[in-house]
């Protein structure tokens, strides 16, 4: 199945890659094709969780003007 996720902000891919490796390092996971899907998935899940928290904090802060 083709990947249809499009990044809307130019340059964000580099940021996300760096974020991914930082979180993997925190978890003690070495990312790569030889790593278990469960380990790689835990990193992806944590990225999503943190990005959602940051977005919620940003939105709640911007609406309290």
UniProtKB/Swiss-Prot annotation:
Q: Which GO terms describe its molecular function?
A: double-stranded DNA binding
| Alphabetic keyword roster | DNA-binding, Sporulation
Intrachain S-S bonds: none
* Site feature (Cleavage) residues: 22-23
Q: What are its GO biological-process terms?
A: DNA topological change; sporulation resulting in formation of a cellular spore
The record ties this protein, via Gene3D superfamilies, to: Small, acid-soluble spore protein, alpha/beta type-like
Task: Identify the PROSITE patterns for this entry.
Answer: SASP_1 (PS00304), SASP_2 (PS00684)
Family membership noted in the UniProt record: Belongs to the alpha/beta-type SASP family.
The entry's other comment says: SASP are degraded in the first minutes of spore germination and provide amino acids for both new protein synthesis and metabolism.
What name is this protein filed under?
Small, acid-soluble spore protein C3
Organism expressing this protein natively = Priestia megaterium
Gene of this entry: SASP-C3
């Amino acid at each position: 199945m083709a990947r249809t996720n499009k990044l809307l902000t130019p340059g964000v891919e580099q940021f996300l890659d760096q974020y991914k490796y930082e979180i993997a390092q925190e978890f003690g996971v070495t990312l790569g094709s030889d790593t278990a899907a469960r380990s790689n998935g835990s990193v992806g899940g944590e990225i999503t969780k943190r990005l959602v928290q940051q977005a919620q904090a940003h939105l709640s802060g911007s609406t309290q003007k």
